[in-house]
Swiss-Prot record:
One of its GO terms (cellular component) is cytoplasm. It comes from Archaeoglobus fulgidus (strain ATCC 49558 / DSM 4304 / JCM 9628 / NBRC 100126 / VC-16). PANTHER family: UPF0235 PROTEIN C15ORF40 (PTHR13420:SF7). Belongs to the UPF0235 family. This is UPF0235 protein AF_2072.
Amino acid sequence: MREAKDGVLISVHVSPGSKEVSFSYDEWRRAVEVRIKSPAKEGKANRELLGIFRQIFGEVELVSGEKSRSKVLKGKRE
């Protein structure tokens, strides 16, 4: 995690198609490791990922990595 002008940036590594949703921290990648159920097709995995993070943090957007397993999310300050 690192601070941004109007929020916080979160580095995430996503593993789609998992049996259950889980979180861990990957020290080597310096990223939150997230396993999600949705497949990486037609944006389904991105929608599930954003939905999970929005439940936890509120307003969240995908900054980079739309078609990659390595993503950067931005949590906005209120």
